[in-house]
Amino acid sequence: MLHDISLKGLTEKYNMDVKGVIHIGAHRGRNIIEYIDIGVRDIVVFEPLSDNFNILEQNLSELNANIIGHQVALGSEEKKVTMYLSSNDTQSSSILKPKVHLTHHPDVSFDDREEVEVKLLDSYNIENCNFIVIDVQGYELEVFKGGKKTLEKI
């Protein structure tokens, strides 16, 4: 399962030198300490949900690292959208209306909503990052469409 893959494991297996990480869909930042532990110097995180971002900011403030956080969703065009908030600690929240998820995980509901701002990854002009972690519940292609220039630098 993809969730079991660690950045440390990837860097060791493929002899990668990860200097900086762009983490899209950072939730509350539980992976950030791993990035720091393996020597990642620059970290840029994106998390659109306000409660998650507040917890993320608090968690980041306790770390002595070069971390920049942005409270936005990323996509292929700038706009405001409604996110569907999941009942599983918002881990499955999505810009896309839940369909298949409801069948595979009937215990998870999407009763709450939150308006979020969507921006282009390219609008951030990120330097010094050579690795992307993305977890946006099926919206990955839209994020990559808005990040073509950034992807060329990775």
Regions found by a protein language model. Give the residues of each.
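Phosphate/nucleotide-binding beta-alpha loop and adjacent structural elements of enzyme active sites
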Residues: 1-154
